Amino acid sequence: MNVLHLRAAYFMENNLAAISMIHGMGVFGNALLPDLKLPMIATRDVGDYAAQRLLDLDFSGKQARELLGERDLSMTEATAVIARGIGKPDLRYEQFPHDQVQQALTQMGVPPKVAALYIEMYKAINAGVVAAQEPRSRENTTPTSFEKFVQDVFAPAYHGKATTA
């Protein structure tokens, strides 16, 4: 059996969960370190890559491919792009304490055990335990920039004009 495992980076779409926070608190934040650079990928790029590989069937045995998005960004950098894209130049990123993030998740309806796993994930990302295993290359870099994602997906969702991607 031929299997290709795709290991996608941090989804750009994860940032959509902060829209209500931006509206309500005027800040963007989570438990990630502000200056830790992360590869961020649009889910559309993952789907496009998977579809192309299934059409080509150019893999054999068991293989893994990391998909790292267009470039690495820190949460501070991503917030600056979001700020420009939604017309809120003063928007800033704030790293929240783990206990506050866990409490917020459970208040949003996330089961406590799942919220605890999110905190474990944030801690592992911040510590470098969860990180890309391959260096960035032409093969694992995808086309959608964070600016394009904000323009096409985040800003319309923020302004209540979301369309299907």
Give the location of each predicted region.
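Oxidoreductase cofactor-interface core, primarily capturing Rossmann-like NAD(P)-dependent enzymes
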Residues: 1-92, 100-108, 112-114, 164-165
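Conserved strand-loop elements at the edges of beta-sheets that form or border functional pockets
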Residues: 95
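A hydrophobic C-terminal alpha-helical subdomain
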Residues: 98-165
